[in-house]
């Protein structure tokens, strides 16, 4: 996990805008406050042909005098796991960050702070591992040292302004604590979502909390991930897990660079906790909603909630299958898109982005690929035998 920092001075500011993108996933912080609410920015594109940048108004985050802009950079789809078997380095082997902060002063002058070799860098922050669908490994006691310097690199693609709906956090679900027949502790959030977990506990330094995520319990009422995993002698994926090593005292954690499909969370820890200490956060595109449903049964409402929480940057798919969020998302697209158009006024923006991916991802012959954005070594047919990665049919 790359950690970048730029310390700069500013005064008499009228407005400030931050332009940022990455080959990978980024999260920016100014003076201790998160920049924007876009989750897993800049989103997924075919990085060889199209990279989208975001623009943030950061005027209120800055102060007269010294300021610090810090950025965490993860592999994301660019270098992280893609496809049912978690293939790596599909678009490149070196994550990259591009940023430009424009400060407009009250006298009309403009000050620019841009990524260059003067930025501080280190890879010793609290997040030790972060992969799309496999999860995160976190050492809460770690603090980035920023003892190194950033390396200047390039990418042969001109960034374009983001034309899509940002992915943001939405519903927060409460947990119900249950004990399986074998005595394991599982949290039931009552609804299958795409998202991640958050918790706040008091612990001693070195204590561990391991979380594993899945959509269902098996026929015996036990936690299982067999319905979503592909397994061989060398690899089992997706892991859908978080391994958190505590610091002394209060520990607050929320997943940063991974997303899971789940309703149930297996908790393995010696840290004392209550179900109220945990929450599940649904993550999907921040579209303007026009449709709601009141129904006499929980089943009817769940039928609406399921597709409502699916869209993330492209058309619907499920995160644990972990394709590169393909624009032609197959069965999920055909099943849910017509419903989503009635629920969300801005659903057409996702379809516009899908068409853009199909266009930029065309073959040299001019024909569209089956599942854009398609990386170098992976081309998965958007036809599924069942809603399970373990039973996926490849072309």
Task: Name what the model sees in each region.
Residues 330:
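Aromatic- and glycine-enriched pocket-lining scaffold segments that form the walls
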Residues 336-347, 382, 386-395:
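Well-ordered alpha-helical scaffold segments within catalytic/enzyme domains
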Residues 327:
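Short, small-residue-enriched loops and turns at beta-alpha junctions
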């Amino acid at each position: 996990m790359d950690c970048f920092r730029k310390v700069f001075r500013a005064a008499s500011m009228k407005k400030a805008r931050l332009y940022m993108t990455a080959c990978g996933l980024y999260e920016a912080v100014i003076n201790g406050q998160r920049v924007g609410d876009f989750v897993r920015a800049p989103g997924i594109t075919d990085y060889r042909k199209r990279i989208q940048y975001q623009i943030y108004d950061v005027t209120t985050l800055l102060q007269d005098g010294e300021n610090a802009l810090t950025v965490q950079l993860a592999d994301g789809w660019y270098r992280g796991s893609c496809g049912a078997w978690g293939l790596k380095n599909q678009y490149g082997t070196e994550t990259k960050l591009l940023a430009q902060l424009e400060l407009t002063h009250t006298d009309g002058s403009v000050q620019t702070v841009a990524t260059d070799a003067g930025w501080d860098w280190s890879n010793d922050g609290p997040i030790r591992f972060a992969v799309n669908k496999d999860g995160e490994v976190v050492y809460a006691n770690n603090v980035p040292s920023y003892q190194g310097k950033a390396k200047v690199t390039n990418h042969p693609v001109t960034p374009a302004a983001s034309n899509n709906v940002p992915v943001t956090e939405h519903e927060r679900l409460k947990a119900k604590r249950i004990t399986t027949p074998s005595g394991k502790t599982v949290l039931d959030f009552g609804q299958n979502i795409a998202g991640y977990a958050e918790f706040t506990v008091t612990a001693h330094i070195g204590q561990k909390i391991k979380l594993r995520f899945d959509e269902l319990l098996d026929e015996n009422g036990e936690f299982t991930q067999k319905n979503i995993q592909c397994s061989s002698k060398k690899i089992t994926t997706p892991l859908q897990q978080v391994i958190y090593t505590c610091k002394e005292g209060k520990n607050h954690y929320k997943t940063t660079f991974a997303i899971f499909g789940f309703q149930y969370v297996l908790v393995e820890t010696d840290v004392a906790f209550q179900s109220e200490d945990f929450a599940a956060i649904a993550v999907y595109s921040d579209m303007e909603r026009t449709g709601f449903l009141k129904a006499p049964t929980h089943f009817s409402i769940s039928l609406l909630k399921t597709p409502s929480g699916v869209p993330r940057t492209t058309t619907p798919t499920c995160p644990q299958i972990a394709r590169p969020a393909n624009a032609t998302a197959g069965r999920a697209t055909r099943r849910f898109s017509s419903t989503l158009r009635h629920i969300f006024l801005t659903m057409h923006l996702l379809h516009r982005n899908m068409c853009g991916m199909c266009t930029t991802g065309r073959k040299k012959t001019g024909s569209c690929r089956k599942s854009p954005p398609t990386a170098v070594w992976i081309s998965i047919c958007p036809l599924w035998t069942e809603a399970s990665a373990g039973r996926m049919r490849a072309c």
